[in-house]
Amino acid sequence: MGSGLVARIRGSYGTKLTLALVVVVVLSVGVGTFVYQQTTTQLETDVRADLTGSADARADHLDAWLSNARGQTQLASRHPVLASGNDTAITRYLEGLAASDERPDGVVAAHVYNTSTTTIEASSADAFTGVNPREQGAPFATDPPSFATTSDVVVAAPFTVPAADFPVLSVLSPIPGTTDKALIYMVNVNTLTDDFGQNVAGSTTTVVSADGTYVSHPDQDRVLTGHDGPSRLLNQSRTQPAYIDANGTVTAAAPVDGAPWSVLVRAPHDRAFALGDFVASSLVGLVLITIVSLSLIGVTVGSTTVTALRQFSRRADEMAAGDLDTDIDTSRNDEFGTLAESFRSMRDSLSESLTDAERATARAEDAREDAEQQRADAEAAREDAEAARKDAQETARALESAAADYEEALTAVADGDLTRRVDASRDHDAMARIGHALNDMLDDIETSVAAATAFSDHVSDAAQRVEADAGDAIDAGTDVSTAVDEISDGATEQTDRLHEVAGEVDDLSASAEEVAETVASLADTAGQAASAVDDGRQATEDAVETMDDVADDAEAAADAMDALDSEMADIGEIVDVIADIADQTNMLALNASIEAARTGADGDGFAVVADEVKTLAEESRDAAEDIESRLLALQGQVSDVADEMRATSDTVSDGRATVGDAATALDDVVSFVADTDTAAGEIRAATDRQAHAASRVASAVDEVAGISQETAAQATAVADSAATQTDTLSSVDDAAADLADRAAALDDLLAEFDAHDDTEPEDY
């Protein structure tokens, strides 16, 4: 089945083109899939690196902010005014801190906090003065930090206050010179992440504390609420960067060194890998464009090419079916136009060949109408024409096949292997046209050589049959000559016997004259006469039978001569066909020489083959003309012998009639003798009548003797004619042997060429 599929693919250009397009599409899809996988892998690495790097950078940013906030808070807490106890000066100083450009980012207020009473004694914002943070749930008040030295700084957990609509965190530093007071920077938590942009579209940055609550979130309502992400990610991010891709979200986390916080950067998976989707869609678009482009190429170029090839194939099938009037015109001026021109040239050549075949068929039909006995020959001619048409169809179908390499094939052809073909499926247009032309020409030469080989075999067989028939005819002529010699001897013997009868009749006449003298011897004489008459009658009957045999033999010999003449006519028809084939082969060789001259140096080997074929064709034609002249002479001699044999048969028939008359006369003599024996009383009168009858018998016997002599002479002439016929048949036998030798020589010459023998001898 695999070989059949391969053969089907190799036998259809459309299938090849479709398969090629499918292979290209599959390769495009494969390459696109590979590129997509590579892009996806690289994109995943890049997204992971980007998000992780962003989380690290923002954690570093927060750590830097915390360090700055700690330093600024510690530095501000060391100002002497804070320990002076002057509330006005302290308030003015706090207001200056809150409005200073050097304050940490996000600071919205500065307070002096009494750790003992947990109240804000002074503030840059009047709303916070006197407020008890513990009552508001401030972590630094509910869980007051401890300061080992005045250099300690504490960052408290975020919380909310009624006076602000945003969550705040506090940075506390003890005020030197006091025992229970600390400077607090109140910071808007939202400002901690305001500077963080979106390195991935749709991404968000949050800060989560160690207890799992949001320190900062784009949604203010989520601040100070529990973290809803994977706890594994949060636990890992406390000590090292972490990354996770789950639930349609990619998250990268990094720890903040200056606080128990983790910075989380989140992005929707589809947004983070939007580039991958874009690449995928681009690849799909590219593949679709490739498929559409290839489809358009297949529909435009491929379909037109396949359509043109199918049209040419259909035209070739029509030509192979015998329709040489099919339209091969095309408006294309490319390779298909050249191919159409080659098809037209081939059609014209085939038309001429078929015209010749039709003419041969017409001649055969005319011959059939002239004589029914030639119907077989006409049928053979029609079969020859049909074979020629089939050969032409095979030549047309042979255009669809391909063979071996040009140089190797032409070398093999030059060496005599006419079965080789060139591979005409070449990209080079001229070589493709030359390949088609060479294949056509090689098909014609191979068909002609195969036909000539088959014809040579048939001529050899026919010559052998003629030689055998001539030998049989020689044997028949020898038999005829022997029979005629026997007839001549019989006729001579018959003449002698008739002379004896004449003597007996003379004796009978003398006895009749002596009857009057003695009646006693009448019975003896009558008995002798009856015996002699019986012998004569028996001799005449033998002569009649012998003449019948001679007539039959002569008629058989004449029929044999007619049959031989018919065989000579058949051989003449064969010789005519040989001459026609020789002329056609000569014309084919001339066309091959012209084609070889047109192809230049590439056709030198082919020109040698064409010249050799032309020489063989001329020798075949000369041999056919020689055989035809010999057959005409032999046919004339055979006709003459047949005419002579019929004349001999007619002469023998006449002699038979004469001998029949003699037999009748002898019967009368027997009657007379009987009358003499029964009528003794009328002996004298009967004796007179007997004398008269004896005289007539003597005359009849003389005539029979003359006829016998003439029969002997005719038999001698027939024997001479038979000898002449034997000599003529010997000449026929020699001519047939010579014809067989020439056919064998032609067969030896044709044997130098290897060709497929697809022609049966009876086709000729």
UniProtKB/Swiss-Prot annotation:
Residues 347-394 have a biased composition (Basic and acidic residues). Residues 303-355, 397-450 form the HAMP domain. Methylated by CheR. GO terms for biological process: chemotaxis; signal transduction. GO terms for molecular function: photoreceptor activity. CDD domains: HAMP, MCP_signal, PDC2_HK_sensor. InterPro entries: HAMP_dom (IPR003660), MCPsignal_dom (IPR004089). It is found in: Cell membrane. Residues 347-401 are annotated as: Disordered. Residues 38-278 are extracellular. Keywords: Cell membrane, Chemotaxis, Chromophore, Membrane, Methylation, Photoreceptor protein, Receptor, Repeat, Sensory transduction, Transducer, Transmembrane, Transmembrane helix. It holds the Pfam family MCPsignal. Residues 469-705 form the Methyl-accepting transducer domain. It is a multi-pass membrane protein. Residues 2-16, 299-764 are cytoplasmic. The chain crosses the membrane at residues 17-37, 279-298. GO terms for cellular component: plasma membrane. Belongs to the methyl-accepting chemotaxis (MCP) protein family. Transduces signals from the phototaxis receptor sensory rhodopsin II (SR-II) to the flagellar motor. Responds to light changes through the variation of the level of methylation. Also acts as a chemotransducer. This is Sensory rhodopsin II transducer. The lineage of its organism: Archaea, Methanobacteriati, Methanobacteriota, Stenosarchaea group, Halobacteria.
